[in-house]
Amino acid sequence: MPDYWIKIAEREDEDLRHHHYLIAAKDEREARKIALKFMERFIDDDENPEKIDDGYAFYNNAILVKLADVKETTKEQFKDFLLKTHTINLT
């Protein structure tokens, strides 16, 4: 089963945060479906998020969570990205 790199954009007021996840799925369509199901519970405190295009709105549109990108990848490529973005190199 291939791996898919899921990029989620979370917007609260003017703040934009990106979250990256790895999902194993049979194809891109299934990966999107799994990602959207995960995103529905992205903010635990909101029991009734509103479905919007490619995502959900929480707290009466105060926080928008959208599926920004889905692409096939490998665990190795995803791990390299995480190491690159979370490693401090002062040289």
Task: Locate each region found by the language model.
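Compositionally biased, intrinsically disordered low-complexity segments enriched
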Residues: 5, 20-22, 79, 88
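A short, exposed loop/beta-hairpin motif centered on an aromatic-Gly-Thr core
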Residues: 16-28
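Short, mixed-charge low-complexity intrinsically disordered segments
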Residues: 37-91
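Short aromatic-glycine-(Arg/Gly/Cys) micro-motifs in beta-strand/loop hairpins
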Residues: 1-19
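Extended low-polarity, hydrophobic cluster-rich segments
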Residues: 8, 22-24, 58-63
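Short amphipathic alpha-helices within nucleic acid-binding modules
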Residues: 29-34
